[in-house]
């Protein structure tokens, strides 16, 4: 296998403790990159770092906390060298009707997925300018078309896409490339938890056949890492998602038609309810953002 352009370069991955972030870390380690793994779950991060065949640094940091990110960046530079690739992967979700959602939980999704991505970019942009590096914003299928019962997540991922497009145009002349990743449904704890709620499971399974398929985190990560090696401006996982860009303006009427048909049926028995933070990552974020004194 030819030597990867990522070999011996320092790569930062946020949200690295589990799911797609963990899969990205393992795929990047296969390219012999030095890895800085950021997230909330210290034990999981440390275990992941210890299992990798490359230098790896596990750091607990909240992507919405500018001071924590600056401290992490200083430690990364001191122990692994200046980062030349940053993957803004940290993300959380909560589902259910907007009208009865918890305003604090709703806003937290925006803060982590959008503001946290921007704060990550702000922290490491000097390094990327110095190294003519690459920033990958992990967006989502939800960036291409919003769905009901996921208003905060869809808004945050649409915002993250727009932020990355803007940043892409701002820093290109400085030698920094910015890419946007559009993963479809990925087999993570977040998705498994969401599928336990009848309304969310049925809304997903009523999507067209290709769009409702859940893909393995390893397969998605492999595709994203190939895009990082090539400094792509966009990467779709799976590849057919690129075609959705052409028809994305037609998606809202389709979603509206399906929702008008399905939501009354789903709401006729047990009323639709908020899910709270989805998955172990969501619960870890809530615990870190609102610690309870012993």
Segments from the language model and where they lie:
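The beta1-alpha1 cofactor-binding region of Rossmann-like NAD(H)/NADP(H)-dependent oxidoreductases
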Residues: 61-71, 103
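Residue(s) in the substrate-gating loop at a strand-loop-helix junction
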Residues: 140
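SDR active-site lid
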Residues: 173-239
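Conserved glycine-rich Rossmann-like NAD(P)H-binding loop of the short-chain dehydrogenase/reductase
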Residues: 31-47
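Active-site helix of classical SDR
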Residues: 121, 156
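Conserved glycine-rich cofactor-binding loop
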Residues: 10, 15-18
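Substrate-binding pocket helix/loop in short-chain dehydrogenase/reductase
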Residues: 97-98, 102-110
């Amino acid at each position: 296998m030819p030597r990867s352009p990522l070999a011996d370069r320092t790569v930062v991955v946020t949200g690295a403790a589990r799911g797609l972030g963990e899969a990205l870390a393992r795929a990047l380690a296969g390219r012999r990159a030095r890895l800085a793994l950021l997230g909330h779950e210290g034990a999981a991060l440390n275990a992941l770092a210890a299992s990798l065949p490359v230098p790896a640094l596990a750091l607990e940091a909240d992507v919405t906390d500018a001071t924590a990110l600056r401290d992490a960046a200083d430690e990364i530079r001191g122990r692994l060298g200046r980062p030349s690739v940053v993957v803004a992967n940290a993300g959380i979700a909560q589902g259910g009707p907007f009208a009865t959602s918890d305003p604090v939980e709703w806003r937290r999704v925006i803060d982590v997925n959008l503001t946290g991505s921007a704060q990550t970019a702000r922290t490491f942009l000097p390094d990327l300018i110095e190294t003519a590096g690459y920033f990958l914003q992990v967006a989502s299928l939800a960036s291409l078309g919003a769905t009901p019962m996921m208003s905060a997540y869809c808004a945050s991922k649409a915002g993250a896409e727009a932020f990355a497009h803007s940043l892409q145009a701002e820093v290109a002349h400085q030698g920094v490339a910015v890419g946007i990743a559009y993963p479809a449904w990925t087999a993570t704890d977040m998705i498994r938890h969401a599928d336990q709620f009848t309304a969310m499971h049925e809304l997903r399974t009523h999507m067209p056949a290709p769009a409702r398929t859940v893909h393995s985190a390893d397969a998605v990560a492999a595709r994203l890492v190939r895009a990082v090696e090539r400094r792509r401006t966009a990467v779709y996982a799976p590849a057919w998602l690129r075609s959705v860009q052409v028809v994305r303006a037609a998606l809202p009427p389709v979603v509206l038609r399906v929702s008008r048909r399905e939501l009354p049926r789903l709401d006729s028995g047990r009323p639709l309810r908020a899910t709270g933070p989805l998955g172990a990552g969501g619960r870890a974020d809530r615990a870190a953002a609102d610690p309870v004194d012993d």
